[in-house]
Amino acid sequence: AANYDIGHLFGASGGGGNAGCIGCVCSADDTKGRGITSPADGIPQGDNFDIDYVVHEVGHQLGGNHTFSQSNESTGVNKEVGSGITIMGYAGITNQDVAPHSIDVFHQASIAQIQANLPTRPCPAGQIITMTANQPPVVSPVPNYTIPITTPFALTGSATDPNGDPITYNWEQN
């Protein structure tokens, strides 16, 4: 069990996915190798397989819980309406779907969970991690607003990147 950090089986016989654990990456026992993804349609390929199944289950192995709110799991991260739409949601597979498939982003709550879990894990053992010189974007501050419920609104934001990297904007309700 010491020769790998994470294990995940890919199949084509149906059954969906199961991480086998939450946050077990690099564990000393065999729980880190219990992940499986085998889509119901028997076609283990394409964006739907990669995002809705594989990355979702690996997200569990890295420490992320579900973000959908169609049922409360008492994890404190059930942030998204209905089935949710980000990677750790259940888009397209509940009776409260808001979209047929996930979008390829983690919710901020998932990122926070994974970032909190990884430093507690004993990996990568004996390896040196080299930080890059990439700098985070600088977000222009905006004032806070309170608007009445059901009021239509538009969100506008701006930021600059010290490295000149392209910027993608994403708003989440929290």
Language model segments and positions:
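Extracellular (secreted or membrane-anchored) zinc-dependent metallopeptidases
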Residues: 1-174
